Amino acid sequence: MLYNGYMITVYSTNTCAYCKQVKQYLTKKGKEFSEVDLDENPAKRQELYLRTNIMIVPITEIDGQLVVGYNLGKLAKLI
């Protein structure tokens, strides 16, 4: 989703506790985001891996910049 002119996407899995925490953080900050569940979308998982060479979740993409894992400091700087 576009937020203040940029897009926020959270790539997550069903069992990832840190993914839930990142989504809660963004919601608490009033940021709209789209979510891609990689468990339900294996093609997107493969596409993301080929693009980033990263197999860790969550991955939060903000205006083309990636935040890997639960890194609230980096998220705060980008939103």
Whereabouts are the PLM-identified features?
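Short hydrophobic/aromatic patches at helix-to-coil boundaries
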Residues: L75-I79
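A short, hydrophobic beta-strand/beta-hairpin element that forms part of a small beta-sheet core
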Residues: P58-V67
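Hydrophobic alpha-helical segments typical of transmembrane helices
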Residues: K44, N71-K74
